[in-house]
Curated annotation (Swiss-Prot):
GO terms for molecular function: mechanosensitive monoatomic ion channel activity. It is found in: Cell inner membrane. Residues 46-74 are periplasmic. Channel that opens in response to stretch forces in the membrane lipid bilayer. Forms a nonselective ion channel with a conductance of about 4 nanosiemens. May participate in the regulation of osmotic pressure changes within the cell. The keyword Ion transport applies. The lineage of its organism: Bacteria, Pseudomonadati, Pseudomonadota, Gammaproteobacteria, Enterobacterales. Its main location: membrane. Keywords: Cell inner membrane, Cell membrane, Ion channel, Ion transport, Membrane, Transmembrane, Transmembrane helix, Transport. Residues 1-16, 95-137 are cytoplasmic. It is a multi-pass membrane protein. One of its GO terms (cellular component) is plasma membrane. It comes from Pectobacterium carotovorum. This is Large-conductance mechanosensitive channel. Gene3D superfamilies: Large-conductance mechanosensitive channel, MscL, domain 1.
Length: 137
């Protein structure tokens, strides 16, 4: 089997395709959440605490000198990423909770009892014959 044929079979398996779709949707969902946090949530939050833009929060460890750039810790971006994480984690939590709820409803429906196997049928016949013999005696 050639390597190309093996790769094609690997790439076309359902799990790999599902994973690829999940990764793409996850990346796009991340962009949406980042936009939600940076464009919708953080501006009013900054306004509530005095018109502060969290992206601008930084700690200068060393100012620029000559050709050497400044050393800066941008903790405002870190705060914004924390908000991103919290919102994404909450959204995933809700999605999993809904999926589990739907799965439980599906599991609650009683399944039809399994049909007896050939061995079980044979044992039932033997039991019935033994009962008949005992009643005759």
């Amino acid at each position: 089997m050639s390597i190309i044929k093996e790769f094609r079979e690997f790439a076309m398996r359902g799990n790999v395709v599902d994973l690829a779709v999940g990764v793409i949707i996850g990346a796009l969902f991340g962009k949406i959440v980042s936009s939600l946090v940076s464009d919708i949530i953080m501006p009013p939050l900054g306004l509530l605490i005095g018109g502060v833009d969290f992206k601008q929060f930084a700690l200068f460890l060393r100012n620029a000198q000559g050709g050497i750039p400044a050393v800066v810790m941008n903790y405002g971006a870190f705060i914004q990423n924390i908000f991103d994480f919290i919102i994404v984690a909450f959204a995933i939590f809700i999605a999993i909770k809904l999926m589990n709820k739907m799965r439980c409803k599906q599991e609650d429906t009683p399944a039809a009892p399994p049909k007896p196997s050939a061995e079980e049928k044979l044992l039932a016949e033997i039991r019935d014959l033994l009962k008949e013999q005992q009643t005759r005696q």
